[in-house]
Curated annotation (Swiss-Prot):
Keyword annotations of the record: Carbohydrate metabolism, Glycosidase, Hydrolase, Polysaccharide degradation, Xylan degradation
One GO BP annotation of this record: xylan catabolic process
Species: Thermoanaerobacterium saccharolyticum (strain DSM 8691 / JW/SL-YS485)
EC number: 3.2.1.37
Listed name of the protein: Beta-xylosidase
Organism placement in taxonomy: Bacteria, Bacillati, Bacillota, Clostridia, Thermoanaerobacterales
Active site: 160 (proton donor), 277 (nucleophile)
GO molecular function: xylan 1,4-beta-xylosidase activity
Amino acid sequence: MIKVIVPDFSDKKFSDRWRYCVGTGRLGLALQKEYIDTLKYVKENIDFKYIRGHGLLCDDVGIYREDVVGDEIKPFYNFTYIDRIFDSFLEIGIRPFVEIGFMPKRLASGTQAVFYWEGNVTPPKDYKKWENLIKAVVSHFISRYGIDEVAKWPFEIWNEPNLKEFWKDADEKEYFKLYKITAKAIKEVNENIKVGGPAICGGADYWIEDFLNFCYEENVPVDFVSRHAYTSKQGEYTPHLIYQEIMPSEYMLNEFKTVRDIIKNSHFPNLPFHITEYNTSYSPQNPVHDTPFNAAYIARILSEGGDYVDSFSYWTFSDVFEERDVPRSQFHGGFGLVALNMVPKPTFYTFKFFNAMGEEMLYRDEHMIVTRRDDGSVALIAWNEVMDKTENPDKEYEVQIPVGFKDVFIKRQLIDEEHGNPWGTWIHMGRPRYPSKKEINTLREIAKPEIMTSHAVTNDGYLNLKFKLAKNAVVLYELTERIDESSTYIGLDDSKINGY
Protein backbone atom coordinates (compact mmCIF):
# COMPACT_ATOMS: atom_id res chain seq x y z
CA MET A 1 0.00 0.00 0.00
CA ILE A 2 1.38 3.38 -1.05
CA LYS A 3 0.22 6.12 1.32
CA VAL A 4 0.15 9.76 0.27
CA ILE A 5 -0.88 12.81 2.29
CA VAL A 6 -1.62 15.74 -0.01
CA PRO A 7 -0.92 19.17 1.54
CA ASP A 8 -3.70 21.73 1.70
CA PHE A 9 -1.70 24.53 0.14
CA SER A 10 0.94 24.95 -2.53
CA ASP A 11 2.48 27.92 -4.28
CA LYS A 12 3.35 25.73 -7.27
CA LYS A 13 1.43 26.06 -10.52
CA PHE A 14 0.76 23.24 -12.95
CA SER A 15 1.71 24.33 -16.44
CA ASP A 16 -0.48 23.52 -19.42
CA ARG A 17 2.48 23.67 -21.84
CA TRP A 18 1.69 20.05 -22.77
CA ARG A 19 -1.27 21.25 -24.88
CA TYR A 20 0.43 24.17 -26.61
CA CYS A 21 0.95 22.16 -29.80
CA VAL A 22 0.26 18.78 -31.41
CA GLY A 23 1.80 17.14 -34.45
CA THR A 24 0.17 16.08 -37.69
CA GLY A 25 0.90 14.10 -40.79
CA ARG A 26 1.95 16.12 -43.84
CA LEU A 27 -0.20 19.19 -44.41
CA GLY A 28 -1.68 17.86 -47.64
CA LEU A 29 -3.60 15.28 -45.61
CA ALA A 30 -5.70 18.12 -44.19
CA LEU A 31 -7.65 18.02 -47.46
CA GLN A 32 -9.18 14.70 -46.33
CA LYS A 33 -12.52 14.63 -44.50
CA GLU A 34 -11.46 12.12 -41.84
CA TYR A 35 -8.43 14.25 -41.01
CA ILE A 36 -10.53 17.37 -40.41
CA ASP A 37 -13.23 15.47 -38.52
CA THR A 38 -10.59 13.95 -36.25
CA LEU A 39 -8.88 17.29 -35.67
CA LYS A 40 -12.21 18.84 -34.63
CA TYR A 41 -12.77 15.95 -32.22
CA VAL A 42 -9.30 16.29 -30.70
CA LYS A 43 -9.62 20.06 -30.39
CA GLU A 44 -12.98 19.77 -28.63
CA ASN A 45 -11.67 17.23 -26.13
CA ILE A 46 -8.09 18.36 -25.51
CA ASP A 47 -7.92 21.95 -26.78
CA PHE A 48 -4.46 22.07 -28.35
CA LYS A 49 -3.53 25.61 -29.39
CA TYR A 50 -1.17 24.93 -32.31
CA ILE A 51 -0.57 22.22 -34.91
CA ARG A 52 2.74 21.38 -36.64
CA GLY A 53 3.41 19.16 -39.62
CA HIS A 54 5.73 18.55 -42.55
CA GLY A 55 5.15 19.34 -46.18
CA LEU A 56 4.29 23.03 -46.41
CA LEU A 57 6.39 23.43 -49.55
CA CYS A 58 6.02 19.92 -50.94
CA ASP A 59 4.50 19.44 -54.37
CA ASP A 60 1.18 17.99 -53.16
CA VAL A 61 0.36 21.30 -51.44
CA GLY A 62 1.40 22.94 -54.68
CA ILE A 63 2.74 26.32 -53.60
CA TYR A 64 5.81 26.42 -55.86
CA ARG A 65 5.24 26.04 -59.57
CA GLU A 66 7.08 27.28 -62.66
CA ASP A 67 5.80 28.65 -65.96
CA VAL A 68 7.78 28.75 -69.18
CA VAL A 69 7.38 32.16 -70.79
CA GLY A 70 9.36 32.29 -74.02
CA ASP A 71 12.90 31.33 -73.09
CA GLU A 72 12.39 32.22 -69.44
CA ILE A 73 11.28 30.08 -66.49
CA LYS A 74 9.19 32.12 -64.09
CA PRO A 75 8.11 30.99 -60.61
CA PHE A 76 4.39 30.90 -59.89
CA TYR A 77 3.12 30.77 -56.31
CA ASN A 78 -0.12 28.84 -55.93
CA PHE A 79 -1.89 29.20 -52.58
CA THR A 80 -5.10 27.34 -53.41
CA TYR A 81 -4.50 24.36 -51.14
CA ILE A 82 -2.59 26.00 -48.31
CA ASP A 83 -5.36 28.58 -47.95
CA ARG A 84 -7.88 25.78 -47.68
CA ILE A 85 -5.71 23.99 -45.10
CA PHE A 86 -4.91 26.97 -42.89
CA ASP A 87 -8.48 28.28 -43.17
CA SER A 88 -9.66 24.92 -41.82
CA PHE A 89 -7.19 25.03 -38.93
CA LEU A 90 -8.22 28.52 -37.88
CA GLU A 91 -11.93 27.74 -38.20
CA ILE A 92 -11.40 24.82 -35.82
CA GLY A 93 -9.56 27.14 -33.42
CA ILE A 94 -6.02 25.87 -33.82
CA ARG A 95 -3.09 27.88 -35.19
CA PRO A 96 -0.24 26.70 -37.44
CA PHE A 97 3.18 26.13 -35.92
CA VAL A 98 4.78 26.54 -39.33
CA GLU A 99 7.54 24.15 -40.39
CA ILE A 100 9.44 25.45 -43.43
CA GLY A 101 10.08 22.41 -45.64
CA PHE A 102 10.64 20.32 -47.59
CA MET A 103 12.15 21.44 -50.92
CA PRO A 104 9.88 21.86 -53.96
CA LYS A 105 11.17 19.45 -56.62
CA ARG A 106 11.44 22.19 -59.24
CA LEU A 107 13.69 24.15 -56.90
CA ALA A 108 15.72 21.22 -55.55
CA SER A 109 19.42 20.69 -56.23
CA GLY A 110 19.02 16.91 -56.14
CA THR A 111 16.54 14.05 -56.08
CA GLN A 112 17.06 12.63 -52.58
CA ALA A 113 13.69 12.29 -50.86
CA VAL A 114 12.20 10.94 -47.65
CA PHE A 115 8.94 9.10 -46.97
CA TYR A 116 6.37 7.46 -49.19
CA TRP A 117 5.25 10.89 -50.36
CA GLU A 118 8.80 11.86 -51.38
CA GLY A 119 9.66 15.00 -49.47
CA ASN A 120 12.79 16.35 -51.15
CA VAL A 121 15.61 16.92 -48.63
CA THR A 122 18.24 18.64 -50.77
CA PRO A 123 19.22 22.32 -50.63
CA PRO A 124 17.78 24.71 -53.20
CA LYS A 125 19.64 24.91 -56.49
CA ASP A 126 19.01 28.65 -56.49
CA TYR A 127 19.01 30.35 -53.08
CA LYS A 128 17.66 33.58 -54.55
CA LYS A 129 14.57 31.76 -55.83
CA TRP A 130 14.26 30.10 -52.42
CA GLU A 131 14.45 33.47 -50.69
CA ASN A 132 11.80 34.89 -53.00
CA LEU A 133 9.57 31.88 -52.34
CA ILE A 134 9.82 32.35 -48.57
CA LYS A 135 9.01 36.04 -48.86
CA ALA A 136 6.05 35.32 -51.12
CA VAL A 137 4.64 32.68 -48.75
CA VAL A 138 4.96 34.84 -45.64
CA SER A 139 3.62 37.91 -47.45
CA HIS A 140 0.60 35.92 -48.61
CA PHE A 141 -0.13 34.70 -45.07
CA ILE A 142 -0.03 38.28 -43.80
CA SER A 143 -2.24 39.48 -46.64
CA ARG A 144 -4.81 36.77 -45.98
CA TYR A 145 -4.79 36.53 -42.17
CA GLY A 146 -3.27 39.84 -41.01
CA ILE A 147 0.01 40.46 -39.23
CA ASP A 148 -1.64 40.37 -35.78
CA GLU A 149 -2.55 36.74 -36.47
CA VAL A 150 0.56 35.61 -38.35
CA ALA A 151 2.84 37.15 -35.71
CA LYS A 152 1.43 34.51 -33.34
CA TRP A 153 2.68 31.67 -35.58
CA PRO A 154 6.19 30.35 -34.86
CA PHE A 155 8.17 29.58 -38.03
CA GLU A 156 10.52 26.60 -37.63
CA ILE A 157 13.10 26.11 -40.35
CA TRP A 158 13.39 22.53 -41.65
CA ASN A 159 13.09 19.18 -39.86
CA GLU A 160 15.87 17.05 -38.31
CA PRO A 161 18.75 18.32 -40.47
CA ASN A 162 21.17 16.34 -38.31
CA LEU A 163 19.94 13.17 -40.05
CA LYS A 164 21.01 12.27 -43.58
CA GLU A 165 17.47 11.07 -44.26
CA PHE A 166 16.13 14.60 -43.74
CA TRP A 167 18.95 16.83 -45.01
CA LYS A 168 21.48 15.89 -47.67
CA ASP A 169 24.62 14.54 -45.98
CA ALA A 170 23.37 16.01 -42.67
CA ASP A 171 25.51 18.98 -43.67
CA GLU A 172 25.51 21.36 -40.72
CA LYS A 173 27.21 24.21 -42.60
CA GLU A 174 24.69 24.00 -45.45
CA TYR A 175 21.79 23.94 -42.98
CA PHE A 176 23.10 27.07 -41.30
CA LYS A 177 23.22 28.73 -44.73
CA LEU A 178 19.61 27.71 -45.39
CA TYR A 179 18.57 28.90 -41.93
CA LYS A 180 20.29 32.28 -42.30
CA ILE A 181 18.76 33.05 -45.69
CA THR A 182 15.31 31.81 -44.63
CA ALA A 183 15.21 33.57 -41.27
CA LYS A 184 16.37 36.86 -42.76
CA ALA A 185 13.84 36.58 -45.58
CA ILE A 186 11.02 36.11 -43.06
CA LYS A 187 12.20 39.04 -40.96
CA GLU A 188 12.46 41.25 -44.05
CA VAL A 189 8.76 40.68 -44.62
CA ASN A 190 7.96 41.48 -40.99
CA GLU A 191 10.36 41.58 -38.07
CA ASN A 192 7.63 40.58 -35.60
CA ILE A 193 7.39 37.03 -36.96
CA LYS A 194 9.17 34.48 -34.75
CA VAL A 195 11.76 32.18 -36.36
CA GLY A 196 13.74 29.30 -34.91
CA GLY A 197 15.37 25.90 -35.23
CA PRO A 198 17.33 23.70 -35.62
CA ALA A 199 14.59 21.06 -35.09
CA ILE A 200 17.11 18.26 -34.54
CA CYS A 201 16.37 14.84 -33.13
CA GLY A 202 18.17 13.31 -30.14
CA GLY A 203 21.81 12.28 -30.09
CA ALA A 204 23.18 15.48 -31.63
CA ASP A 205 22.76 18.24 -29.06
CA TYR A 206 26.10 19.73 -30.14
CA TRP A 207 24.09 21.00 -33.13
CA ILE A 208 22.19 23.28 -30.76
CA GLU A 209 25.40 24.73 -29.34
CA ASP A 210 26.79 25.20 -32.86
CA PHE A 211 23.50 26.68 -34.06
CA LEU A 212 23.30 29.28 -31.29
CA ASN A 213 26.96 30.19 -31.70
CA PHE A 214 26.40 30.60 -35.45
CA CYS A 215 23.38 32.85 -34.90
CA TYR A 216 25.38 34.98 -32.46
CA GLU A 217 28.51 35.25 -34.57
CA GLU A 218 26.66 35.89 -37.85
CA ASN A 219 23.96 38.10 -36.30
CA VAL A 220 21.23 35.76 -37.56
CA PRO A 221 17.70 36.09 -36.14
CA VAL A 222 16.63 33.37 -33.68
CA ASP A 223 13.54 33.63 -31.48
CA PHE A 224 13.30 30.05 -30.19
CA VAL A 225 15.13 26.73 -30.10
CA SER A 226 13.44 23.51 -31.22
CA ARG A 227 14.27 19.84 -30.80
CA HIS A 228 12.60 16.41 -30.98
CA ALA A 229 12.54 13.66 -28.35
CA TYR A 230 11.87 9.92 -28.57
CA THR A 231 12.84 7.17 -26.15
CA SER A 232 13.03 4.04 -28.31
CA LYS A 233 16.19 2.11 -29.07
CA GLN A 234 17.09 0.48 -32.38
CA GLY A 235 14.43 -1.98 -33.41
CA GLU A 236 13.59 -5.36 -34.81
CA TYR A 237 12.03 -4.79 -38.22
CA THR A 238 9.38 -6.89 -39.94
CA PRO A 239 7.73 -6.09 -43.30
CA HIS A 240 4.79 -4.41 -41.54
CA LEU A 241 5.91 -3.55 -37.99
CA ILE A 242 8.87 -2.59 -35.83
CA TYR A 243 9.49 -3.64 -32.22
CA GLN A 244 11.71 -1.48 -30.02
CA GLU A 245 12.71 -1.32 -26.39
CA ILE A 246 11.45 1.86 -24.75
CA MET A 247 13.67 3.58 -22.21
CA PRO A 248 12.20 4.92 -18.94
CA SER A 249 10.38 8.24 -19.06
CA GLU A 250 13.08 10.05 -17.07
CA TYR A 251 15.33 9.60 -20.11
CA MET A 252 13.12 12.00 -22.07
CA LEU A 253 12.82 14.44 -19.17
CA ASN A 254 16.61 14.46 -18.82
CA GLU A 255 16.88 15.34 -22.51
CA PHE A 256 14.55 18.27 -21.90
CA LYS A 257 16.75 19.42 -19.00
CA THR A 258 20.00 19.00 -20.93
CA VAL A 259 18.95 21.21 -23.82
CA ARG A 260 17.47 23.81 -21.49
CA ASP A 261 20.87 24.01 -19.79
CA ILE A 262 22.61 24.38 -23.16
CA ILE A 263 20.36 27.33 -23.95
CA LYS A 264 20.94 28.91 -20.52
CA ASN A 265 24.70 28.73 -21.05
CA SER A 266 24.54 30.21 -24.56
CA HIS A 267 24.53 33.79 -25.82
CA PHE A 268 20.71 33.54 -25.81
CA PRO A 269 19.93 32.28 -22.28
CA ASN A 270 16.28 33.32 -22.31
CA LEU A 271 15.16 31.84 -25.61
CA PRO A 272 11.94 29.78 -25.54
CA PHE A 273 12.54 26.06 -26.02
CA HIS A 274 9.99 24.00 -27.97
CA ILE A 275 9.94 20.22 -28.29
CA THR A 276 8.21 20.09 -31.67
CA GLU A 277 7.96 16.29 -31.74
CA TYR A 278 7.93 13.64 -29.02
CA ASN A 279 6.60 10.15 -28.47
CA THR A 280 7.80 6.79 -27.23
CA SER A 281 8.90 5.43 -30.62
CA TYR A 282 10.01 7.40 -33.67
CA SER A 283 8.42 4.83 -35.99
CA PRO A 284 4.81 4.98 -37.24
CA GLN A 285 4.84 1.17 -37.33
CA ASN A 286 5.48 0.42 -33.66
CA PRO A 287 2.44 -1.15 -31.93
CA VAL A 288 3.44 0.47 -28.64
CA HIS A 289 1.60 3.62 -29.75
CA ASP A 290 -1.71 1.74 -29.75
CA THR A 291 -1.40 0.37 -26.21
CA PRO A 292 -2.40 1.30 -22.66
CA PHE A 293 1.33 1.19 -21.84
CA ASN A 294 1.87 4.21 -24.06
CA ALA A 295 -0.94 6.03 -22.25
CA ALA A 296 0.55 5.36 -18.82
CA TYR A 297 4.09 6.14 -19.97
CA ILE A 298 3.17 9.52 -21.45
CA ALA A 299 1.41 10.61 -18.24
CA ARG A 300 4.65 11.45 -16.45
CA ILE A 301 5.86 13.44 -19.46
CA LEU A 302 2.68 15.52 -19.38
CA SER A 303 3.01 15.94 -15.63
CA GLU A 304 6.64 17.13 -15.55
CA GLY A 305 7.67 18.19 -19.05
CA GLY A 306 6.44 21.76 -18.67
CA ASP A 307 9.04 22.33 -15.95
CA TYR A 308 11.79 22.40 -18.58
CA VAL A 309 10.32 23.44 -21.93
CA ASP A 310 7.96 26.09 -23.23
CA SER A 311 5.98 23.53 -25.19
CA PHE A 312 6.13 19.86 -26.14
CA SER A 313 4.17 18.64 -29.13
CA TYR A 314 2.91 15.04 -29.19
CA TRP A 315 3.58 13.37 -32.53
CA THR A 316 0.73 13.07 -33.75
CA PHE A 317 -3.00 13.69 -33.25
CA SER A 318 -4.22 11.16 -35.85
CA ASP A 319 -3.31 7.96 -37.70
CA VAL A 320 -4.31 9.70 -40.93
CA PHE A 321 -0.61 9.67 -41.70
CA GLU A 322 1.45 8.33 -44.59
CA GLU A 323 5.20 8.42 -43.95
CA ARG A 324 5.69 4.71 -44.61
CA ASP A 325 2.73 4.31 -46.99
CA VAL A 326 -1.03 4.43 -46.76
CA PRO A 327 -1.85 2.62 -43.49
CA ARG A 328 -2.42 -1.09 -44.07
CA SER A 329 -4.69 -1.87 -41.14
CA GLN A 330 -6.94 -0.39 -38.46
CA PHE A 331 -4.14 -0.59 -35.90
CA HIS A 332 -0.61 -0.54 -37.30
CA GLY A 333 1.53 1.23 -34.71
CA GLY A 334 0.66 4.72 -35.95
CA PHE A 335 1.64 7.76 -33.91
CA GLY A 336 -1.88 9.14 -33.56
CA LEU A 337 -3.89 9.85 -30.44
CA VAL A 338 -6.82 8.72 -32.56
CA ALA A 339 -6.70 5.61 -34.76
CA LEU A 340 -8.26 5.33 -38.20
CA ASN A 341 -12.05 5.53 -38.35
CA MET A 342 -11.93 7.97 -35.41
CA VAL A 343 -11.26 5.36 -32.74
CA PRO A 344 -9.59 7.06 -29.74
CA LYS A 345 -6.55 5.24 -28.37
CA PRO A 346 -5.75 5.00 -24.65
CA THR A 347 -3.20 7.84 -24.93
CA PHE A 348 -5.98 10.13 -26.18
CA TYR A 349 -7.63 9.75 -22.79
CA THR A 350 -4.41 10.45 -20.91
CA PHE A 351 -4.43 13.83 -22.64
CA LYS A 352 -8.14 14.31 -22.02
CA PHE A 353 -7.65 13.48 -18.33
CA PHE A 354 -4.93 16.13 -18.08
CA ASN A 355 -7.30 18.60 -19.69
CA ALA A 356 -9.36 18.28 -16.49
CA MET A 357 -6.52 19.41 -14.22
CA GLY A 358 -6.47 22.66 -12.26
CA GLU A 359 -3.74 25.27 -12.04
CA GLU A 360 -2.80 24.90 -8.35
CA MET A 361 -0.53 21.86 -8.00
CA LEU A 362 -0.99 20.39 -4.53
CA TYR A 363 1.12 17.27 -4.97
CA ARG A 364 3.23 15.50 -7.57
CA ASP A 365 5.48 12.46 -7.72
CA GLU A 366 6.62 10.09 -10.47
CA HIS A 367 3.21 8.38 -10.67
CA MET A 368 0.65 10.92 -9.45
CA ILE A 369 -0.38 14.54 -9.68
CA VAL A 370 -3.07 16.33 -7.64
CA THR A 371 -4.37 19.79 -8.54
CA ARG A 372 -7.02 22.18 -7.30
CA ARG A 373 -9.25 24.08 -9.71
CA ASP A 374 -10.46 27.66 -9.40
CA ASP A 375 -13.84 26.50 -8.02
CA GLY A 376 -12.17 24.51 -5.21
CA SER A 377 -12.73 21.10 -6.78
CA VAL A 378 -9.82 18.68 -6.90
CA ALA A 379 -8.49 16.55 -9.78
CA LEU A 380 -6.09 13.63 -9.29
CA ILE A 381 -4.36 11.58 -11.98
CA ALA A 382 -2.33 8.47 -11.17
CA TRP A 383 -0.67 5.97 -13.51
CA ASN A 384 1.11 2.65 -13.41
CA GLU A 385 3.26 2.06 -16.49
CA VAL A 386 4.77 -1.43 -16.39
CA MET A 387 8.08 -1.58 -18.22
CA ASP A 388 8.63 -5.34 -17.96
CA LYS A 389 6.68 -8.60 -17.72
CA THR A 390 6.37 -8.61 -13.93
CA GLU A 391 3.91 -11.04 -12.34
CA ASN A 392 2.57 -8.58 -9.75
CA PRO A 393 2.16 -5.23 -11.48
CA ASP A 394 -0.72 -3.83 -9.40
CA LYS A 395 -0.25 -0.85 -7.10
CA GLU A 396 -2.52 0.04 -4.19
CA TYR A 397 -2.93 3.61 -2.95
CA GLU A 398 -4.36 5.37 0.05
CA VAL A 399 -4.44 9.11 -0.54
CA GLN A 400 -5.57 11.76 1.93
CA ILE A 401 -6.81 14.72 -0.09
CA PRO A 402 -7.77 18.17 1.25
CA VAL A 403 -11.25 19.10 0.07
CA GLY A 404 -12.88 22.43 0.85
CA PHE A 405 -16.41 21.10 1.26
CA LYS A 406 -18.03 18.53 3.54
CA ASP A 407 -20.08 16.51 1.07
CA VAL A 408 -18.14 15.25 -1.96
CA PHE A 409 -19.23 13.83 -5.33
CA ILE A 410 -16.56 11.47 -6.67
CA LYS A 411 -16.18 10.70 -10.36
CA ARG A 412 -13.59 8.18 -11.46
CA GLN A 413 -12.49 7.49 -15.05
CA LEU A 414 -10.14 4.60 -15.77
CA ILE A 415 -8.20 3.17 -18.68
CA ASP A 416 -6.00 0.09 -18.48
CA GLU A 417 -5.59 -3.24 -20.25
CA GLU A 418 -9.25 -4.15 -19.59
CA HIS A 419 -10.90 -0.74 -19.95
CA GLY A 420 -10.69 1.80 -22.76
CA ASN A 421 -8.41 -0.45 -24.79
CA PRO A 422 -9.70 -0.76 -28.39
CA TRP A 423 -6.37 -2.25 -29.49
CA GLY A 424 -7.01 -5.21 -27.18
CA THR A 425 -10.54 -5.63 -28.52
CA TRP A 426 -9.23 -5.47 -32.09
CA ILE A 427 -6.89 -8.35 -31.23
CA HIS A 428 -9.88 -10.31 -29.85
CA MET A 429 -11.65 -9.65 -33.18
CA GLY A 430 -8.77 -11.30 -35.04
CA ARG A 431 -6.95 -8.10 -36.03
CA PRO A 432 -9.19 -7.20 -39.00
CA ARG A 433 -7.25 -4.98 -41.37
CA TYR A 434 -10.34 -3.21 -42.68
CA PRO A 435 -13.04 -3.61 -40.02
CA SER A 436 -16.72 -3.51 -40.90
CA LYS A 437 -18.92 -0.64 -39.77
CA LYS A 438 -20.24 -2.87 -36.99
CA GLU A 439 -16.72 -3.66 -35.81
CA ILE A 440 -15.76 0.02 -35.95
CA ASN A 441 -18.74 0.90 -33.76
CA THR A 442 -17.67 -1.76 -31.27
CA LEU A 443 -14.14 -0.36 -31.18
CA ARG A 444 -15.47 3.14 -30.56
CA GLU A 445 -17.66 1.89 -27.72
CA ILE A 446 -14.81 -0.05 -26.14
CA ALA A 447 -12.46 2.95 -26.43
CA LYS A 448 -14.31 4.85 -23.71
CA PRO A 449 -12.92 4.79 -20.16
CA GLU A 450 -14.71 2.97 -17.39
CA ILE A 451 -16.66 5.57 -15.39
CA MET A 452 -17.75 5.07 -11.80
CA THR A 453 -19.31 7.52 -9.35
CA SER A 454 -19.86 7.67 -5.60
CA HIS A 455 -20.09 10.21 -2.81
CA ALA A 456 -18.41 10.61 0.56
CA VAL A 457 -18.10 12.93 3.53
CA THR A 458 -14.79 14.56 4.47
CA ASN A 459 -13.18 14.13 7.88
CA ASP A 460 -11.52 17.27 9.26
CA GLY A 461 -11.29 18.67 5.75
CA TYR A 462 -9.74 15.55 4.21
CA LEU A 463 -11.10 12.78 2.02
CA ASN A 464 -9.47 9.37 2.32
CA LEU A 465 -9.32 7.82 -1.16
CA LYS A 466 -8.31 4.20 -1.66
CA PHE A 467 -7.77 2.62 -5.07
CA LYS A 468 -5.79 0.01 -6.96
CA LEU A 469 -4.06 0.50 -10.31
CA ALA A 470 -3.65 -2.53 -12.52
CA LYS A 471 -1.01 -2.88 -15.23
CA ASN A 472 -0.72 0.26 -17.39
CA ALA A 473 -3.66 1.97 -15.72
CA VAL A 474 -4.33 5.69 -15.85
CA VAL A 475 -7.04 6.99 -13.53
CA LEU A 476 -8.66 10.40 -13.16
CA TYR A 477 -10.51 11.26 -9.96
CA GLU A 478 -12.57 14.45 -9.86
CA LEU A 479 -13.82 15.59 -6.45
CA THR A 480 -16.55 18.22 -6.59
CA GLU A 481 -19.02 19.63 -4.08
CA ARG A 482 -22.16 17.56 -3.66
CA ILE A 483 -25.38 19.52 -3.20
CA ASP A 484 -27.98 17.13 -1.77
CA GLU A 485 -31.53 18.13 -2.72
CA SER A 486 -33.12 14.89 -1.51
CA SER A 487 -35.11 16.70 1.20
CA THR A 488 -37.00 18.65 -1.46
CA TYR A 489 -38.69 15.47 -2.76
CA ILE A 490 -41.95 14.96 -0.84
CA GLY A 491 -42.48 11.34 0.16
CA LEU A 492 -39.07 10.20 -1.10
CA ASP A 493 -38.30 6.61 -0.05
CA ASP A 494 -36.06 4.52 -2.32
CA SER A 495 -36.65 1.45 -0.14
CA LYS A 496 -40.10 1.16 -1.71
CA ILE A 497 -38.54 0.38 -5.09
CA ASN A 498 -38.31 -3.39 -5.65
CA GLY A 499 -34.87 -4.64 -4.75
CA TYR A 500 -33.71 -1.40 -3.13
